[in-house]
Amino acid sequence: MSQISAKDVKDLRDTTGVGMMDCKKALEETGGDMQKAVEYLRKKGAALAAKRAEKDASEGMICIKVAEDRKAGVILELNCETDFVARGEVFTGFAGALGQLALEGSAASAGALLGMTLSAEFGGEKVEDAIKTMTGKLGEKIELKRLVFCDAADGLVEAYVHPGAQLGAIIHIASAQPDSARELARDLAMQVAAAAPIVVDRSAVPEELIAKESDIYRQQALGQGKKEEFVDRIVQGRIEKYYQEVVLTEQAFIKVNNMKVSDVLGEFRKQHEAAVEIREFVRYQLGE
């Protein structure tokens, strides 16, 4: 067996990010051949990934990347097994690299990102293989759970990530005054993260959902002994309250409690003589 030098071990560690003892073992198993040692470690990572496939990866982080010109953005959730790994530089750096690759490559889905190729910093591997390599490096199951790419060629994207990176939101708006609307867009992204709306406006609430909620409220009212002639009014009142909870434009604005989001949009229109249209938003909370 050829002599394995400390420099070779260090070089392999610098290349792969794997621990010193594992690097030494890889070099010993491959007769000191650096390329074969790298491949050995990749295979080891793939084997560990297969072994840990059934493990529960419920920790991790929400990563958001937005283009400098605000014309595109991406939000993704990357999972691991423990909070300790989720907070580490290796994991967060990997999540950031995936987010940047998804942004630059306009990845339409998590599946599309898995087929893209990372930079040399991550071995020039496809994301699918790099996740296996990262599993071997960190000793935990790593999983790309979900991803949404937002194309805002007709407007701009803003985002908010809550401290701890377990909650985040991205929003796409359109306005004839995009520069003036950026601060409002950031506030709206924070609104989405904090208040968890499900649709932009009332018209987007599925009819079957309203029918379901109405039936629940009706049964509750009857169960409380309310008279039949008052039940419809009670149900309608509760449905209005439901709209205020789940419709973004009807929610109380988190920065000014006596104003709705729709009021804030109206104030912007008056001040800037330009409307702001909310095109779409995505909210991710870790583990949902």
From Swiss-Prot:
The keyword Nucleotidyltransferase does not apply. Pfam families: EF_TS. It comes from the Bacteria. It is found in: Cytoplasm. Residues 82-85 are annotated as: Involved in Mg(2+) ion dislocation from EF-Tu. Gene3D superfamilies: 1.10.286.20, DNA helicase RuvA subunit, C-terminal domain, Elongation factor Ts, dimerisation domain. GO terms for molecular function: translation elongation factor activity. Keywords: Cytoplasm, Elongation factor, Protein biosynthesis. GO terms for cellular component: cytoplasm. Belongs to the EF-Ts family. Associates with the EF-Tu.GDP complex and induces the exchange of GDP to GTP. It remains bound to the aminoacyl-tRNA.EF-Tu.GTP complex up to the GTP hydrolysis stage on the ribosome. NCBIfam families: tsf. This is Elongation factor Ts. It comes from Chlorobium phaeovibrioides (strain DSM 265 / 1930).
